[in-house]
From Swiss-Prot:
Binds 2 copper ions per subunit. This is Polyphenol oxidase 3. The record marks G392, F393 as: Cleavage. Belongs to the tyrosinase family. It comes from the Eukaryota.
């Protein structure tokens, strides 16, 4: 048994396995929503020194860089966050983290339910037992320009309606919009030392710009659907899927890189230069924003989907690239590495190997309801098909054969009878992740001479960072970490030149290298690095076309090794 005793072990939620719900469905359930709001109020009101408080749970991810819930202090620890980024443990560490939050939320909801004095008190108590953290499915987009996947209760409403303990309807201040520090943490620096509450999408005056944030989410939605689809279907190994470290042979974003950009959807305006990050745009401060938990709930859901699709693949060996509170630089990481500061009821550290079956912790997702009790193989086939349907490109523009072809390729079920072949075009960016001291974005946009606007942005590759005077030494130790990200181009190619084909078969040549190079040169792609400091000298950018095909009877595209990957030069213009 470990000698590191935890005062708040992660034991999971007892009883029946219950689903974490999409936030759009969750808010329609009055009992769930009321209990969630009340539980947040309870956690946010707790003294910031209480390990079960909203502040302390958020602080596990970053500042104030203190030990969490340890019975005895541990000596010689790095002054750093606990969270693992850029390593093979990124998905599993955050699974344990999300579940620790969920367990604490669930306990608070149970206490809240006991306060109801109405005749249906038993129903409130049962609802509290069934309550799980909801997720924001930011990868889903139904081809609706006004769809953002978040209800007003999460992003707009300063007051929300809930049921009071006596059964009447009341309005209360919305605890999902912000966390109010009491007091502001003394180790916060810069703007974070001035903001009394968490800040989303700050403008040049350092004020919250919610309508700008919503416009940014809408503009990014089609790209996120394609990024999510490619992340789930083209990363066959744990090394490719798990983190943003550069890997030979990658052709789609990792789970972590897509996750980075979602942080920035809430945490920064990409059109501002220099960058003005809010809390969600800075690693040391991100988990203090209540939306963090919805975001990371979806990160875990995507991990569960990928696990089911690749049921014979799990955590592979990798190198720890930066110091954390629980890991040293250069340490070899495996599925048996401890996930500090999370301990079992037996006071042993949780390990990735313990977390492979997420139901161990008392939750699941609605996506798996149709295949309960099925074999791993049957679940894999079903989820593969479901991912194609849910995240594959869908279009109502049936007059555009190039988009119909793209839709056919991405939405084919495993029993399809046609073999599809298509070049997949991406912008590929590699860079030293710690070259700059804080978060930064690499932004790609059309019509370079016209300037960068939300409407012209094709996509971004984002370094989700955050440096303080206390942890800057970690960056020096991690200088050699090369990260990579991708921006997928086929949707834009299909939209713009697809009208030149009469049928889907005629559209295939439109994705061939010669036509694509001609098209992209005309679109004048600009690239700019937006940060709060200097130039990113390590950045290397290229456009790559990989020949993929979808065999008859399969739902996962395969790289055609008989054809070379094509590199297009002299297309992207670097803008200072």
């Amino acid at each position: 048994m470990s000698d590191k005793k935890s005062l708040m072990p992660l034991v999971g939620i007892p009883g029946e396995i219950k689903n974490r719900l999409n936030i759009l469905d969750f808010v329609k359930n009055d009992k769930f929503f009321t209990l969630y709001v009340r539980a947040l109020q309870v956690l946010q009101a707790r003294d910031q020194s209480d390990y079960s408080s909203f502040f302390q749970l958020g602080g596990i991810h970053g500042l104030p860089y203190t030990e969490w819930a340890k019975a005895q202090p541990q000596l010689h620890l790095y002054k750093a966050n606990y969270c693992t980024h850029g390593t093979v443990l990124f998905p599993t560490w955050h699974r344990a983290y999300e579940s620790t939050w969920e367990q604490t939320l669930w306990e608070a909801a149970g206490t809240v339910a006991q306060r109801f004095t109405t005749s249906d008190q038993a129903e409130w108590i049962q609802a509290a037992k069934d309550l799980r953290q909801p997720f924001w499915d930011w990868g889903y987009w139904p081809n609706d320009p006004d769809f953002i996947g978040l209800p007003d209760q999460v992003i707009r409403d300063k007051q929300v309606e809930i049921t009071d303990y006596n059964g009447t309807k009341i309005e209360v201040e919305n605890p999902i919009l912000h966390y109010k520090f009491h007091p502001i943490e003394p180790t916060f620096e810069g703007d974070f030392a001035q903001w009394q509450t968490t800040m989303r999408y700050p403008d040049v005056q350092k004020q919250e710009n919610i309508e700008g944030m919503i416009a940014g989410i809408k503009a990014a939605a089609p790209g996120f659907r394609e990024w999510t689809f490619n992340m789930l279907t083209k990363n066959y190994t744990w090394e490719l899927f798990s983190n943003h470290g550069a890997v030979v042979g990658a052709h789609a974003n990792s789970l972590e890189m897509v996750h980075n950009t979602v942080h920035f959807l809430i945490g920064r305006d990409p059109t501002l230069d220099p960058l003005v990050p809010g809390h969600m745009g800075s690693v040391p401060h991100a988990a203090f924003d209540p939306i963090f938990w919805m975001h990371h709930c979806n990160v875990d859901r995507l991990l569960a989907l990928w696990q089911t699709m690749n049921y014979d693949v799990y955590v592979s060996e990798g190198m720890n690239r930066e110091a954390t509170m629980g890991l040293i630089p250069g340490q070899v990481l495996t599925e048996d590495s401890p996930l500090e500061p999370f301990y079992t009821k037996n006071q042993d550290p949780w390990q990735s190997d313990d977390l492979e079956d997420w139901e161990t912790l008392g939750f699941s997702y609605p996506d798996f309801d149709p295949v309960k009790g099925k074999s791993k193989e049957e679940k894999s086939v079903y989820i593969n098909d479901w991912v194609h349907k849910h995240y594959g490109f869908v279009t109502t523009q049936t007059e555009n054969p190039a988009l119909r072809l793209l839709s056919s390729f991405q939405r084919a079920k495993s029993d399809h009878e046609t073999q599809y072949a298509l070049y997949d075009w991406v912008i590929h960016a590699t860079f030293r992740y710690y070259e700059l001291n804080n978060s930064f974005s690499i932004i790609f946009y059309f019509d370079e001479g016209e300037g960068c606007t939300l409407e012209s942005i094709i996509g971004t590759v984002d370094a989700f960072r955050g440096t303080t005077s206390e942890n800057c030494a970690n960056c020096a130790r991690s200088q050699d970490l090369i990260a990579e990200g991708f921006v997928h181009l086929n949707y834009y190619i299909g939209c713009d030149i697809g009208q030149h084909a009469d049928h889907e078969d005629d559209a295939v040549p439109l994705y061939e290298p010669t036509r694509v190079k001609e098209y992209l040169k005309k679109r004048k792609i600009g690239c700019k690095v937006v940060s709060a400091e200097g130039e990113l000298t390590s950045l290397v950018v290229e456009i790559k076309g990989a020949p993929y095909y979808l065999p008859v009877g399969e739902a996962r595209p395969k790289l055609d090794h008989e054809k070379p990957i094509v590199i297009l030069d002299d297309i992207i213009h670097r803008v200072n």
